[in-house]
């Protein structure tokens, strides 16, 4: 039997999709294109309305295929099911099976029954799955880099966010289990692991006082040889002081942090139910650069939050002009059904939200152009990704200061190297987000 899988949403969702791939592979299924497949699956995102709309469009595209080939089966998985199961069941009768976020590890059993015509519920909603190293998983990223999801769920209660109600409470994997998975990845040739969670700094909060992110990192440093360890999605917290010290002392933890701060105005942050203020953010950025002057910092901002004034919005631009963060994403606020902020007064007009978003992105583009110039004339370690997406005449890769999929890249215009190598590159030019350089040496 053959299947086709579409994966939507974030890296954490992609790990779930890789579990689906691994489970179906082990059950004897073969992956193919949507026309040749007996089974059509889509792992959905339901975090924000644009993601919901994208997921529905993908499902309807599969429904169109099934209209021409009614023998095909459609399975919808993930966050959209978790959030809107009743509405989906009513509005999409063409879908044969709906599976919530916690059902990915049992997908082979569910689709086996579906294909065999055995009786089972049309909507399957298991509770509180936790990834382990023993769960089958087929890596879909290039062989030299992988995502490692160290928690499920979230205990933070941001007023605009539905993740806790979709993904459930925080559940942390054991240190030994994460270590086992990373050791297997290194043995298969992985050069870079990116630790991911809704909030990495919350790792271990449910496991007792002796387990936290620092403990995990020290074990990974001591018991694996992975060259690059990247940390994505952290909260400003008390843990960060010690984390910065550990990063500064261990070059295998790349000098890069992704901390989605969302805003800098104290009143807006309070309304968002974020547990820090502008002074905390400024202190963290200054501390990070005191420990590691070359650290790259990424963040995201949410503009147009209910009640946000033009003056409060302008504080973000002031913050960026002074602190000059390396990588910035900006998103317009959208009301999410069931989130507390849905009912907040003084909702901001969509046109104003889009304008604020565009202006902030334009500012960051100007700042980024200047920030990138500091790399020109330096030699940087670059993880080679392969032939450039822009032209077959160039190779491309990333420095430790660039995360996959979201940041810029290094275009390699001189020298012969292969994907998966970490090489020394002399940076000769910079662009708005990208760098250009040639090979100096290969590790």
From Swiss-Prot:
Belongs to the methylthiotransferase family. RimO subfamily. InterPro entries: Elp3/MiaA/NifB-like_rSAM (IPR006638), Methylthiotransferase (IPR005839), Methylthiotransferase_CS (IPR020612), Methylthiotransferase_N (IPR013848), Methylthiotransferase_N_sf (IPR038135), NA-bd_OB-fold (IPR012340), Ribosomal_uS12_MeSTrfase_RimO (IPR005840), rSAM (IPR007197). GO terms for cellular component: cytosol. The lineage of its organism: Bacteria, Pseudomonadati, Thermodesulfobacteriota, Desulfobulbia, Desulfobulbales. Its cofactor is [4Fe-4S] cluster. It comes from the Bacteria. Catalyzes the methylthiolation of an aspartic acid residue of ribosomal protein uS12. This is Ribosomal protein uS12 methylthiotransferase RimO. SMART domains: Elp3.
